[in-house]
Swiss-Prot record:
Name assigned to this protein: Septation ring formation regulator EzrA
Name of the gene: ezrA
The keyword Cell division is assigned to this record: yes
UniProt-listed NCBIfam families: PRK04778.1-7
Membrane topology designation: Single-pass membrane protein
Length: 567
């Protein structure tokens, strides 16, 4: 019974699905049918009727016939074929041949899409033809006005265009032929070709208008402004030469002739209507002329610099020489008291050598200024280099002088350090005396002797003449290590001795009961009396810990408490 119900449910499901699927497919057929009807009702005939208002000859007639044939084929052949395919689709559905129906629907949709594109193309091309005719008719009248205005300007102001006027006249005359060509193409119905003529004519007249606007200014530059600047440069050059300036290195006369030739080339470019080249050439000429002005101005400024700075630089050298002489005397005095490393002496000899070279170089420059055979700009460069070297040498000299002063300062610092280390050594001895130790271990006594000797070595170094500060510094470093190590060893030794003594006293309570403790403490006392405090502490701790674990911690706490009370 359950199987029967399952079969019935599956059958019902299949029937429902089949019904819904067929309904969906019929909706697709209805959509495609509506699309087909919408294409058939497109206003293509109305658009084609607009074309008939134009001259139906030549290119227009050919285009009209092509569009008409395309539309007739769509209406009479292609759309009826779509209708037949839709009918076949319905037949497949009625026979439940869903796969064939679905495939055919896809083909119909692709076909309608292609027809849609074809219809759009026809309408767009028609609109382009009609629009181009209307736009061309409007623009050609505007271009006629532009052309008339250009001819009037050329006629009225022909003199402002120089040699370019004839070629401008030729170009404007050729433009008139373009108007005639446009009229013939329009009359023949070749509206698209006529549109191309309009665009070419517009580009040509725009170009001519731009040229006619720029040529007068360019001619003014080449015929008036630039030649005037070259003449001014030539006059300025001659005046400066008469005033004693050396300008041979600038080659001004040859450069001015080259600029004059370049102006002639620019005028030729304008006459040939090579306006962009002419504009670039004028810009280059302006930049080159500005450079010439800058070069002459540079010589004037260099002359002012040389005249004003020469005395100041001479004073700088004199002052530096006097300072170097004082430093030389100071260095000789310092050498009697301090040992100067070879590198420092070599540095000072280098300063003296550079000083002589700078003085010699300055005298040579003075001679060249007096001879008046060298350009001021070159003299200025040399003086500026000289000033830079003087500044560098002043810095080196100052560093050397500060080094000499630092030697005495370093000596005082070294003596202060020696005093500090002596105090630290005395503090170590005071701690030993205060601790009332029975004696000093031999290693400690050796360290004490070593520390004293290191301090004596520093003192001896400080008394040497000349004083060798690097050697003093090395001796100071050795003494510092020795004294600090002794101080640390002193504190450690006193602590060990005090703890050993406390541990022995603490362990005395176990002497009678534990023979081993008695023996161990006797060994610790023996070591203590023989100044081996470290080993005595170790022996005492091991002994008391054997009978009372943790005893040493209590001894340490008692010892620390006593120390705090004493402080």
């Amino acid at each position: 019974m359950e199987i029967v119900w399952i079969v019935l449910l599956l059958g019902a499901g299949v029937i429902i699905y089949n019904h819904m699927y067929r309904k969906k497919m019929y909706r697709e057929i209805d959509r495609l049918e509506a699309w087909k009807i919408e294409l058939m009702n497109r206003p293509v005939p109305d658009e084609l009727a607009k074309v008939k208002q134009l001259n139906m000859t030549g290119e227009t007639e050919q285009l009209f016939e092509r569009w008409r044939q395309q539309w007739d084929e769509i209406v009479a052949v292609k759309l009826p074929n779509v209708e037949e395919q839709l009918f076949d689709t319905e037949t497949f559905l009625d026979k439940y041949r869903y796969r064939q129906a679905r495939k055919l629907i896809g083909q119909i949709e692709d076909g309608l899409r292609r027809l849609e594109e074809e219809v759009h193309q026809i309408i767009d091309e028609v609109n382009e033809l009609i629009g181009s005719e209307e736009q061309s008719r409007t623009e050609i009248e505007e271009l006629r006005a532009v052309h008339r205005e250009a001819k009037k300007t050329l006629l009225a102001y022909r003199y402002t265009f120089g040699a370019a006027a004839d070629l401008l006249d030729v170009r404007l005359t050729e433009a008139e032929k373009q108007f005639e060509s446009f009229a013939k193409l329009t009359e023949a119905g070749n509206y698209l070709a006529a549109r191309g003529v309009v665009q070419e004519l517009k580009q040509e007249l725009d170009s001519l208008a731009t040229m006619m606007e720029e040529i007068p200014a360019l001619l003014s530059e080449c015929q008036t402004s630039l030649p005037a600047q070259l003449a001014e440069l030539a006059d300025g050059y001659r005046e400066m030469e008469q005033s004693g300036y050396i300008l041979d290195h600038l080659h001004i006369e040859r450069t001015l002739a080259e600029k004059q030739e370049k102006i002639g080339q620019c005028l030729a470019m304008i006459g040939e209507l090579r306006i962009e080249e002419a504009k670039q050439t004028v810009a280059e000429l302006k930049e080159e002329i500005d450079t010439l002005y800058d070069l002459l101005e540079k010589e004037v400024l260099a002359n002012q610099y040389v005249q004003t700075e020469m005395p100041r630089i001479g004073g700088m050298l004199t002052e530096l020489a006097a300072e170097a002489k004082e430093t030389s005397a100071e260095a000789m005095f310092v050498q009697q008291s301090y040992h100067l490393p070879p590198s420092d002496l070599e540095k000072y000899r280098s300063i003296e050598k550079q000083m002589h070279q700078l003085q010699k170089r300055f005298l040579l420059i003075e001679d060249r200024v007096a001879e008046a055979k060298t350009a001021y700009s070159l003299l200025r460069e040399e003086l500026e280099q000289l000033v830079g070297q003087i500044d560098m040498m002043k810095e080196e000299h100052e560093q050397f002088r500060l080094m000499l002063q630092a030697l005495r300062k370093d000596e005082l610092i070294a003596r202060e350090k020696l005093d500090d280390m002596r105090k630290k050594l005395s503090e170590s001895l005071r701690l030993v005396q205060k601790s009332r130790l029975p004696g000093l271990p031999e290693p400690y006594a050796l360290e004490l002797t070593e520390a004293k000797n290191s301090l004596q070595n520093v003192a001896a170094r400080l008394e040497e003449k000349p004083l060798d500060m690097p050697a003093v510094d090395r001796a100071l470093e050795e003494a510092k290590v020795s004294v600090e190590r002794l101080y640390e060893r002193t504190v450690e030794m006193i602590e060990q001795a005090s703890l050993a003594e406390r541990a022995i006293q603490y362990g005395n309570r176990y002497r009678r009961r534990y023979p081993a403790v008695h023996k161990g403490l006797e060994e610790a006392e023996f070591l203590f009396r023989h100044y081996d405090y470290e080993e005595a502490l170790r022996q005492a701790v091991a002994t008391i810990e054997s009978v009372e674990p943790g005893a040493f911690d209590r001894v340490q706490k008692l010892w620390q408490a006593d120390n705090e009370d004493e402080q």
